[in-house]
């Protein structure tokens, strides 16, 4: 796997996944960081029209040498959230809860969280903190404190006005010819980072996002070493087995065809069945609970009559989601039985998981 930095030359435009027409909505929203489809589109000019390589990311990179990942959502401030059923001595185990849904999560006070309200919390965590998280299952209170500018949000939003032009002309439309759009500017010393299983001669430029804005693609071997260390530790935790946490570091697309061939998305993999059952005819699985947030809409494109047209929206679980399992379980997207379409999501970098072993000795309980 070869790792690269993406350094924007100016602002970037990533229009949100909602249908947009200046006549209906004079304000075009923006979504950032870009999804795997946007990255694949930028790479097409370098590696060919048909993307067959494996993509990791995108993530953030600080000062050209450190990977940053979205904060795990299994915390309230610095206090970890633990499934109720994993806290056998808690009196709330006598309470009723809907067993057709994931188990409720309870906040467990961190032993070193004194004065935690006196600082701002990181929304993106550096490589060294994630390594400790994978090794111990804990993130100390001081590791949540912002130490570098941009760790709360590595980008700024700039509002730009646009004039819509008449087709095949350079004249502004008389009606609905003006709208406003949000542009993204990365803060100083920040860049995007991606991994690709293909070597590309760098430095080179790519078109990224809307309106042909350009960015520099630069090889960075430091990031390769960091990713290999994380992947090795994650695989070791997966092999250990037992109670585990799956940490989602890129948007997770978990969709399944239902009646009338309608695809439905949810915030955890469909193949991960709940560990608790409501009747004896059900087969229990390994999934105990989920810590997640609002779904992320993803707008793709598809071929229709030799034309590229907008595809139906897909809703992904947000980066940082945490899944609590009694035993680690692989994704269907990574299995040999997976369809070509299912494997495509992983190929584009979606649904990337890091595994953490959960032990009582870590101090959670």
Identify the function of each model-found stretch.
Residues 2-365:
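Conserved active-site/ligand-binding neighborhood in enzyme cores
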